[in-house]
Amino acid sequence: MIIVDTNVVSELLRPEPEPCVEQWLSRQDGQTVYLTAISEAELRHGLAIMPAGKRRTALMDAVDHILREDMAGRILPFDSAAAQSYAIIAAGRRAVGRPIMQADCQIAAIAHAHGAPVATRNTPDFEGCGIDLINPWNAE
């Protein structure tokens, strides 16, 4: 299981995604790639604040396809186990003077509860959370 951060999905939605991200994803077993409900919320929020128009409509269709088809059955909720991990991660980061954004902490907590790594461009945001990190922008 690998949990992809919101920025990985956002990259794939760009008109010209970074080839390294596409290549990294193509090397993964699709059934082992997961998303969190937090990332779903971030994607949907980003679309909701976009101006109405063709671009927004096209991106909404693409995101709906990803969520309903590509990631069907592989969107992880923020549950009680994640809530326990959240408390540990947030307190630990605060104790060392590195507070973490709520959404990042929720994603990290879901990954921690599942023993899964997070694939993200923003690895510093997730350091010190007790999870493994993968950066598809510079993965071998």
What are these regions (language model features)?
Residues 1, 108-140:
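Acidic, PIN/NYN-like endoribonuclease modules and their adjacent C-terminal/linker elements
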Residues 1-39, 47-66, 140:
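Short, well-structured N-terminal submotif of metal-dependent ribonuclease cores
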Residues 7, 20, 84, 105-106, ...:
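Active-site phosphate/pyrophosphate-handling residues
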Residues 9, 40-43, 83, 126:
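A generic structural signal for short hydrophobic patches within well-formed alpha-helices
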Residues 11-12, 24, 46, 86-89, ...:
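Residues that scaffold the ATP/ADP-binding catalytic core of kinase and kinase-like folds
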Residues 28, 71, 129-130:
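Short, structured coil segments at secondary-structure junctions
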Residues 45-51, 69-117:
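Active-site neighborhoods of divalent-metal-dependent phosphate/nucleic-acid chemistry enzymes
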